[in-house]
Amino acid sequence: MNSSFHLHFLDLNLNATEGNLSGPNVKNKSSPCEDMGIAVEVFLTLGVISLLENILVIGAIVKNKNLHSPMYFFVCSLAVADMLVSMSSAWETITIYLLNNKHLVIADAFVRHIDNVFDSMICISVVASMCSLLAIAVDRYVTIFYALRYHHIMTARRSGAIIAGIWAFCTGCGIVFILYSESTYVILCLISMFFAMLFLLVSLYIHMFLLARTHVKRIAALPGASSARQRTSMQGAVTVTMLLGVFTVCWAPFFLHLTLMLSCPQNLYCSRFMSHFNMYLILIMCNSVMDPLIYAFRSQEMRKTFKEIICCRGFRIACSFPRRD
C-alpha cells in the first residue's frame, strides 16, 4: 500500500505476488513493516468456491417457488454482491498471473485503469452488501412487528423496486469511484458510509430484539395468529443477525486499514496493522464463502433445494431427504 492514499489492489497484489516469488523479506516502499504475502492460488481458490456457492444460492431461489419471497429476493441481491467480490478477485488474480509471467504486456497507465475497475467492483460489492443487509433487516422488522399487514406492505413489486434502487445506487457509487479514484474524499466517503450503515443496522437489531419477544406474545394471543409463523420470523431475524455478524467481522479490518491509511500511514503501529492487507482481502472473500453456508445451515428449504440442484437425476434415491412425520 503506498502513501498516496489510493486503494490500488492490483498494484498491491502484484507486489505481494512478486514477494512470494522472490522471497519473504519484501517490504512496502512506504511502510517500515514487511507486507504479508499470500499466494495468488489462495485468492483464486476462494474466488472460485464463492462464485460457485453463490450461483447455487441464486439458482435455488429461482428454482424453488417456496423461496419466492421478499426476504429471499434480498438474499439473492446479497449473493450477487458476494459474486461480484469473487469475480473481481478471480479476474484480478488471472491478470496478476498474466502480467507476472509476461503473457500480458501493457502500459502502467492502463494497469492503473484496470486497477480502478477492480477497486470499483469492491466498492459496489460492499455498498450492495450493506444495502441488501439493511433491506433484509427491514423486511424482518416488518414481518415481526406488522405480521398481519406484511403481505400488503412488502409486496413482490415493492421488493423488486428496492433491489433495483439498491443496484442503481451502487452502480453510481462505482462510477464515482472510477471518475474520482485519485481523491481521498472518495475513500473517506466509503469509510463513513460503512460505519454509518453498520451503526444503523446494529441499532435496528437491538431495537428489534428488545421488542420482539413481547410483540410475538401479543400477536400469538390474537385470534387466528400463527405461532409457527412468528417462530419462522424470529428464525429469519436470527439468520440475518448471523449474516450481519459475519459481514462485520470480515469487512471491519479492511475499513480499519483504510482509516489508518488516511490517518497515520507512517506510524509504526499503523504500519504493522496495514502490512496484513492481503489477509483482510482474504477475510472479505471468506465472507462471500460463508454466507451461502449460513443460508444452508439456517434454512431447511434452502438445503433441500441445494441437494436437488447438486444431485443428478439418477441419484435421487441416494440424495433424497428423510421425510418427517
Curated annotation (Swiss-Prot):
The keyword Chaperone does not apply. Expressed in the brain but not in the melanoma cells. SMART domains: 7TM_GPCR_Srsx. Glycans are attached at N2, N15, N20, N28. Gene3D superfamilies: Rhodopsin 7-helix transmembrane proteins. The chain crosses the membrane at residues 38-61, 74-97, 115-138, 156-179, 187-211, 240-265, 274-297. It is a multi-pass membrane protein. It comes from the Eukaryota. A lipid is attached at C311, C312 (S-palmitoyl cysteine). One of its GO terms (biological process) is adenylate cyclase-activating G protein-coupled receptor signaling pathway. Residues 1-37, 98-114, 180-186, 266-273 are extracellular. The keyword ATP-binding does not apply. Receptor for MSH (alpha, beta and gamma) and ACTH. The activity of this receptor is mediated by G proteins which activate adenylate cyclase. This receptor is a possible mediator of the immunomodulation properties of melanocortins. Belongs to the G-protein coupled receptor 1 family. This is Melanocortin receptor 5. The lineage of its organism: Eukaryota, Metazoa, Chordata, Craniata, Vertebrata. The gene is MC5R.
